[in-house]
Amino acid sequence: ICVGGVVFEDEQRVSDGSAARDARAPVISSRPAALLHAAGGAAAVELAESEDVRAWLAGEGPAFAVGDAATDTDLERVAALWHAHPDVLLAGTAATIGAAAGAVAGVGASPRSPRPHVEGPVLVVCGSLHPAARAQVDALVAAGALAVSPGDDPGAAVAALRAGRHVVLASGRPNGDAIAPADAVATSQALAALAFQLEAAVRVPTVIVIGGDTAAAVLGDQPVEVGGTVAPGVAWCRPSGETEALVLTKPGGFGSPSALIVLIAAKMSP
């Protein structure tokens, strides 16, 4: 949520939580306006009330604005105001974009693409080092999935997938607090290469990719058909090319430890 221009997660400023210890891109401020300024943007105004948002959209104030939102109703309110000003670029979390889509499509609109059926076995590819992501893959392995790393012999993973067992392909866990950008890219590419090798050896109906760098490496620059979400923060798409796999992507710092188990169990139900 964002209150007074400050972003909180679990009632804690994000700069005081696990996001501040992210190995790839640690959060250094809980104020988006400050981050915009640090990135070279012009001054940004923080908007607390609907009237503030309405006035800014009408042209009063600097080029950037950060609006408060603590509930879904707040997001819907901001999205409705924004919808009347299509010249303004709206950016935010998946929930923000979802509210914007609702404002554009209208209340009760049906999705253009039906929600897909998640067929097993599932290959999970995780390059994120966020504690939330690691807790999720650990829970799935504890529930019976096979854990493999880029340096492992893929034979065991192929055999597991052929037997209908879920496989978790995850990067190692370095001892240092920070990861160099080049190392992060190399790790993501290694994960993607092994994932491609597994998909070439055995039919993998569903691939779940955790982490932005990992998703970029797995999806590459091929066109993809993005259909929507299967759960909060979890998007689904179907890449073009030889594979027919359903690909789900999710951020590393999102969800409870049981998120993968619940996602797979719920969506594999008839």
Model-derived regions: residue spans:
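General beta-strand structural signal in soluble alpha/beta enzymes
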Residues: 43-49, 65-69, 89-93, 98-99, ...
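Cap/lid and interdomain-hinge subdomains that line or gate substrate/regulatory clefts
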Residues: 1-77, 82, 270
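Redox- and metal-dependent alpha/beta enzyme cores, enriched for Fe-S-associated oxidoreductases
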Residues: 112-190, 194-196
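Short, flexible loop segments at boundaries between secondary-structure elements
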Residues: 93-120, 229-253
